[in-house]
Amino acid sequence: MTKPIPRIGLRRNGRIGLRKNGRRISKGVIHVQASFNNTIVTVTDVRGRVVSWSSAGTCGFRGARRGTPFAAQTAAGNAIRTVVDQGMQRAEVMIKGPGLGRDAALRAIRRSGILLSFVRDVTPMPHNGCRPPKKRRV
């Protein structure tokens, strides 16, 4: 029988591997994707390489609680805490989606002490593209 391959790194919240703490980042981009079911916060450098990320699900919220504003605030705080330790001082914020966590995540980002150069809404809006699904009848 073959030997199992040992896992290298830290397994926390379903993620395997340690974060790269070697890079010093002064400016970055914070992407907030807020759906009705979850909120995902991704922090990248200006070239688009992911530095840190978090979501309401990885913060321990399950089911309907993932879509709440408090869960979005917690996810944003978790993602930003690591990049503040790496020296990030300025950021641009891109917010996508119609979820409840939009404002709460932005509030958590503002409270973190990072200077925001701009906040942009990048929610995709169709110019009358695909036909939407039929209305629910309850």
From Swiss-Prot:
<keyword id="KW-0934">Plastid</keyword>
<keyword id="KW-0694">RNA-binding</keyword>
<keyword id="KW-0689">Ribosomal protein</keyword>
<protein>
    <recommendedName>
        <fullName>Small ribosomal subunit protein uS11c</fullName>
    </recommendedName>
</protein>
<keyword id="KW-0150">Chloroplast</keyword>
<comment type="similarity">
    <text>Belongs to the universal ribosomal protein uS11 family.</text>
</comment>
<keyword id="KW-0699">rRNA-binding</keyword>
<dbReference type="InterPro" id="IPR019981">
    <property type="entry name" value="Ribosomal_uS11_bac-type"/>
</dbReference>
<keyword id="KW-0687">Ribonucleoprotein</keyword>
<dbReference type="GO" id="GO:1990904">
    <property type="term" value="C:ribonucleoprotein complex"/>
</dbReference>
<dbReference type="Pfam" id="PF00411">
    <property type="entry name" value="Ribosomal_S11"/>
</dbReference>
<dbReference type="InterPro" id="IPR036967">
    <property type="entry name" value="Ribosomal_uS11_sf"/>
</dbReference>
<comment type="subunit">
    <text>Part of the 30S ribosomal subunit.</text>
</comment>
<dbReference type="GO" id="GO:0003735">
    <property type="term" value="F:structural constituent of ribosome"/>
</dbReference>
<dbReference type="InterPro" id="IPR001971">
    <property type="entry name" value="Ribosomal_uS11"/>
</dbReference>
<dbReference type="GO" id="GO:0005840">
    <property type="term" value="C:ribosome"/>
</dbReference>
<dbReference type="GO" id="GO:0009507">
    <property type="term" value="C:chloroplast"/>
</dbReference>
<dbReference type="InterPro" id="IPR018102">
    <property type="entry name" value="Ribosomal_uS11_CS"/>
</dbReference>
<dbReference type="GO" id="GO:0019843">
    <property type="term" value="F:rRNA binding"/>
</dbReference>
<dbReference type="GO" id="GO:0006412">
    <property type="term" value="P:translation"/>
</dbReference>
